[in-house]
């Protein structure tokens, strides 16, 4: 089974968590694209979706899935999204696709976070994948200096502007032993919008595409 086939299996497996007549939170990325394809097969049974990125919004609209503004929605039963890394405690690094702030907002609203990945994304310790930090443009250099003090090597992701009009610093060489603490420390830096650690709001269910099929893990 190829990596993409494992992603597809995880994406389709998430369908069983979608409630009839509900509005579904939808994330961003290659694995989520498979979930969107799956969601389109039951679009008549759901009210619609809330999206964490312009890319996902466009794909869903093209498939005929109604997309709502989050401000007009009172309840999201589930949020389905991928991760760049996830550990055994359901802490994640996300934001490789630069949609981390909107992803974090939608995740905060949802009652249940379903994370869909292939088995290459499971790790013991977070940090091999660079940690994305969304930054107000004028604060970029200041924030980078503060991130160095925390032990990281920040690199400006050139040519990338987020859907919110901000820039991304990718922080390398962090061995993240306490994800919740680091998430708070980085978010307290003036000029940071948010960072790609999803530890305070981790996943509730993890669906992992493997060569032997989809494995399900539940937060303890």
Curated annotation (Swiss-Prot):
GO molecular function, one term: ribose-5-phosphate isomerase activity
InterPro entries: NagB/RpiA_transferase-like, Ribose5P_isomerase_typA_subgr, Ribose5P_isomerase_type_A
A single cellular component GO annotation: cytosol
Keywords linked to the UniProt accession: Isomerase
Catalysed transformations (reactions): aldehydo-D-ribose 5-phosphate = D-ribulose 5-phosphate
Binding site for substrate: 28-31, 81-84, 94-97, 121
EC number of this enzyme: 5.3.1.6
Alphabetical list of Pfam families matching this protein: Rib_5-P_isom_A
The keyword Isomerase is annotated on this UniProt entry: yes
Residue stretches spanning the membrane: none
Active site: 103 (proton acceptor)
A biological process from GO: D-ribose metabolic process
Disulfide-bond pairs as recorded: none
Pathway membership: Carbohydrate degradation; pentose phosphate pathway; D-ribose 5-phosphate from D-ribulose 5-phosphate (non-oxidative stage): step 1/1
Enzyme category, top tier: isomerase
Parts forming coiled coils: none
Keyword field contains Kinase: no
Function comment: Catalyzes the reversible conversion of ribose-5-phosphate to ribulose 5-phosphate.
Subunit description: Homodimer.
Family indicated by similarity: Belongs to the ribose 5-phosphate isomerase family.
Protein name, as recorded: Ribose-5-phosphate isomerase A
Source organism (scientific name): Shewanella baltica (strain OS185)
């Amino acid at each position: 089974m190829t990596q993409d086939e494992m992603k597809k299996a995880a994406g389709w497996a998430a369908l069983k968590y979608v409630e009839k007549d509900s509005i579904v939170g939808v994330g961003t990325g290659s694995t989520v694209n498979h979930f969107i394809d799956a969601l389109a097969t039951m679009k008549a049974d759901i009210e619609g979706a809330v999206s964490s990125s312009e890319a996902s919004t466009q794909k869903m609209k093209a498939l005929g899935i109604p997309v709502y503004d989050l401000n007009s929605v009172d309840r999201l039963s589930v949020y389905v999204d991928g991760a760049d890394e996830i550990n055994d405690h359901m802490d994640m690094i996300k934001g490789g696709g630069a949609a981390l702030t909107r992803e974090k907002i939608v995740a905060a609203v949802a009652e249940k976070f379903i994370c869909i990945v292939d088995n290459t994304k499971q790790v013991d310790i977070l940090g091999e994948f660079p940690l994305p930090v969304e930054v107000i443009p004028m604060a970029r250099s200041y924030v980078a200096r503060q991130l160095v003090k925390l032990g990281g090597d920040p690199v400006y992701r050139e040519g990338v502007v987020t859907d919110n009009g901000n820039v991304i610093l990718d922080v390398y060489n962090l061995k993240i032993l306490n994800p919740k603490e680091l998430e708070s420390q980085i978010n307290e830096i003036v000029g940071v919008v948010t960072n790609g650690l999803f530890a305070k709001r981790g996943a509730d269910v993890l669906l992992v595409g493997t060569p032997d099929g989809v494995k399900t893990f539940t937060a303890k």
